[in-house]
Amino acid sequence: MKCSFHIPEKYQWASTLFVHVALIAGVAVYTVFGALSMQWLESPDRVRALLKRELKPVESLPPPPSISGLPDRITRVYLGEELAILDPGVHECLERTILTLFHDTKCDPYSFEHLNIELIDRCYAEANVPIPEGYGGQPRKKIKNKEEEKDVIDETPAEKWSIGNSVIFAFTVITTIGYGHVAPETFEGRLFLIFYGVIGVPFTLLTIADLGMFLTRFLKNLLTMARRFAHYLVKLYQKAKKQRNKSQKTSPVMPDSERSEVWNTGKEMKEMSMRTAREPGEGDEIEVIENGNDENGKEEDEEEPENNEPRKTEESIALGITFTCYLVAGAKILSVYEPEMDFFKALYFNFVTLTTIGLGDFVPKSFDYLLITLIYIGIGLALTTMAIEIAADLLKKLHYIGRKMENVGQAVVWFGGKKMTMKSLVKHLGDQFNIPEEELANFDMSAFVDNAIKVEKGEIATLRKPPTPPVVFRERAFSFSNVRNSSESALKYVDDNRFSKTTQPTIYTVIIHETTRTIDTLHNLADAIRRDPSIPRLDLDVHYLTDMSAPTSFDENYLRTYTNARRK
């Protein structure tokens, strides 16, 4: 037993809105999930533990070779990352030294060019690295108590996998931007990133495409409103110009009373002339249209721009203007709260990000406004999707120029969330209008689509066939004038004196014309039947005369009985 959940029609809009909101909320939750996961997988403690396992202990190093001519002192080169693991005080020294240099030089480019980095080298040279006594080194200085150890750890610089950097990393992964400012270093982090991207990239791109469709519809509505407003302004201008021309052509000013009388008289004469020239009811309608007072005409003129969809050129121009304004406005906003970006750098960052180039030379640093930055990037990616869609349509046109349409019947048409092939759609449409199956089987769909495109371009007026004369079903009585011979000059009635059995031996079908004599003739015929018992009785009940679907002028039963009697 199948259970189906039916949403009431009045709540359909709510379900559609819920789908859009759910997609956006899903991307947000997925981004936070990825950020927290990467922050845990790439935590400094786990990375240090892994690096310590990979590095060989100093005590396990072999003793120096006792070869003549070699120095007694052996030097081993450590990387900065290895020194930071062996002695966390290196970062403390570097941070303090760099801040001092910034303060002394005041960020002057010339001073930076001639900067002496001896102080920085001293931090590495004075690193407290445990070296065996056999190599001439000194043992590592131990921390006296836990409080001093806590102070050293708290004074270390901010970790690269902070919550802000983790969110930016997760968002740039699923949007395929990929700044590259941070990257996973552990096996677990890299493995998680693969599965995270496999699921998140399609889901996020689907959400961005859905948002792009919403923005496309919104942009089309704006274009339609702009076109309607322009049409309205043109009509106002034409109306004002027409009134100005009329005022210039009028005679000298007359009193208001005389002017109204002349106007009313002219209007009445026009109405009378129009009514005499046309059938009743037709003149009024035409006159109203001529006077420009047809309200339906106004509504059609106003609704006409709504029915015409914006052309691709208009969409392209509008999208280009919108995208440019969006870049400039975003650059102005980002330059306010991003410390490393001025207006041009913010504009450069927006372009590189929204086009998914993602060089990573500039990364958002203001984590307090990170939500605004991510929303801006998401809407910008939707605008980029719109541009890609328009460009794809243009490329399709260029690709199929000069090619003949093939396999039109298998083209898929989408109706909301359901799809149907063109062939099935035409078949169901033919069944709806009772078109014979032979015609549907012989229907050339490619030619039909080709002609329909020509109609849209204006090359063909219409695909409608010329109308055939309609079959008229007569609702009035069937008259003898429709069946009599051309040589017969007049109709013959039962009560007519010209009708004689001697001169007209043949039995004629007594058909009575639609005249005022019909009822009298029937009554006379009934009286004749009563006088002559040999003639069967003609039923003149009101039920027979009123309940027939179409009025008739003779009794078929009587005619059949009367004819058989004459033949005998």
Swiss-Prot record:
Keywords: Ion channel, Ion transport, Membrane, Potassium, Potassium channel, Potassium transport, Transmembrane, Transmembrane helix, Transport. Residues 1-15, 212-316, 391-568 are cytoplasmic. It is a multi-pass membrane protein. The keyword Nucleotide-binding does not apply. Expressed in ray A-type neurons and cell bodies. Also seen in head, pharyngeal and phasmid neurons, and in coelomocytes. Potassium channel protein that may be component of regulatory network that controls ray development and function. Belongs to the two pore domain potassium channel (TC 1.A.1.8) family. This is TWiK family of potassium channels protein 9. It comes from Caenorhabditis elegans. The lineage of its organism: Eukaryota, Metazoa, Ecdysozoa, Nematoda, Chromadorea. The gene is twk-9.
